[in-house]
């Protein structure tokens, strides 16, 4: 392959990678690829929400360190991150459903905002090199009700609790990057996708 394929192929080899929400659909596919690329994967998630789940169907539990913890529990998240000191963190743990957010707005906001805040606070308090990628959603942008592809320069917003919580998660990530990581030599890179 070309140089880009070689670099990408080896970037996760023998690296410790934390994936929150690893039992969900996207998290399960991400873990599958990370294992294939040679990563040492640590997962933090609740029980899978479907039965059977992709996580179970792919037989991933035998290939990773699997924690079943609530992302809102700061002390548990802190212990896991301190113990494993991941070189990459992919944050996918979320309440991901728009319709559920109408029935459970408090849970939606607490999971999607405090989960992000908890991980970033651990990184702020403890010095080690890592890359943090916060997976949000195109729903984090203000809904213009037009046929339009959103881009990262669009205004954040949200007409429903889920969308608003994802916009807040983007703002929290940006705030931590600007306030604590941008001009420090702690070797923490932060981004959202």
Which residues fall in each region the model found?
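N-terminal Rossmann-like NAD(P)+-binding domain of SDR-like oxidoreductases, especially those catalyzing
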Residues: 1-193
């Amino acid at each position: 392959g070309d140089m880009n394929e070689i670099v990408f192929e080896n970037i996760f080899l023998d690296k410790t990678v934390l994936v929150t929400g690893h039992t969900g659909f996207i998290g399960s596919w991400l873990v599958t690829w990370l294992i294939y690329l040679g990563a040492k994967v640590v997962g933090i998630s609740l029980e899978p929400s479907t039965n059977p789940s992709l996580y179970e169907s792919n037989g991933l539990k035998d290939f990773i360190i699997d924690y079943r913890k609530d992302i809102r529990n700061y002390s548990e998240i802190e212990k896991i991150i301190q113990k494993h000191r991941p070189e990459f963190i992919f944050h996918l743990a979320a309440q991901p459903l728009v319709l559920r957010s109408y029935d459970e707005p408090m849970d939606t906001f607490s999971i999607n905002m405090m989960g992000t805040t908890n991980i970033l606070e651990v990184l702020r308090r403890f010095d080690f090199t890592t890359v943090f990628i916060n997976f949000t959603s195109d729903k984090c942008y203000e809904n213009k009700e037009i046929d339009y592809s959103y881009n990262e320069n669009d205004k954040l917003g949200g007409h429903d609790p889920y969308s608003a919580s994802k916009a807040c998660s983007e703002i929290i990530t940006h705030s931590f990057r600007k306030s604590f990581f941008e001009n420090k030599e702690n070797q923490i890179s932060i981004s959202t996708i």
